[in-house]
Amino acid sequence: MLANILRTDRHAHRTLPGDSEQARAVAVLARAQQHAVWDRVQVHNQLRQLVGDFYLAALAAFAGTGRTMLDSSAARTILTAAPTPQHARALTVERLGALLVQAGRQRGVDREARRLHAILTAPQPRQAPPVEQAMGHHLLAVLRHLDVVCGNLEDLTQAAEAAFATHPDATVITSFPGVGPLTGARLLAELGDDRARFADAKALKAYAGTAPITRASGRRALVSARRARNDWVVAAGYMWTVTAIRCSPGARAQYDRRRAAGDSHSAAQRNLLNRLLGKLHHRLQTGVPYDEAQAFATSPPAAA
């Protein structure tokens, strides 16, 4: 049956991309690294829920910007040494300082140790002693799991970045604003290095889901976002555009123009990614690194 399909309908099917072995290796590592990120988020959320049930001082001590930092090296080291509020009350400033150094902190150790000591030794709601002790055992088990997950993530991140650095396209990809070794590895993993895979930039944009869909009937036209897309590219593109807006004046101006025109944040970000992908396709085809002046060239002012 498969042979007959190829004989009669070969024109209706696309051939698999002819990516190099190097690109396929980067794809394996980049996707494994992304799965490790999701594993860390899942275990971190489990830890946060458990800590919130009996150890509120830990939530306050390791509160970050927008989320808790219980998965940080310092938090994991200190919570392993003091898995319950009872253990935390016995910690001294000197002991906390030693734990911070053990976790890798080098600056502001004394100041941070005093801050943590004030929070962890302050009065807080407590569970009954047997329940608190049982939850402490549970906490240690989750921390051991989180240590393994964080170790795997660090190892896969280093491997993905190292594999990407040896690829010939790495120089062009990382020349774009907002693209570091990890984001570059994720982009290469999904786009590949087969130059014949995408006939033009429009094909790449449609594959990534950044190109809008226009439905027209008579005098009416509806422009909507594309739902069929490669979510891996979208995830990498989100981080790319967030960073590009901060470090590229041209990208910032493009985003601001779309926002001023009435686009939502996600729509303006998608528009920017659509434009950046088009430029990435062109630069990969030519092998020439990114040029900010050419990428976001402004039209000359009209003559008076």
Where are these regions (language model features)?
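A detector of single, family-specific signature residues
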Residues: 1-304
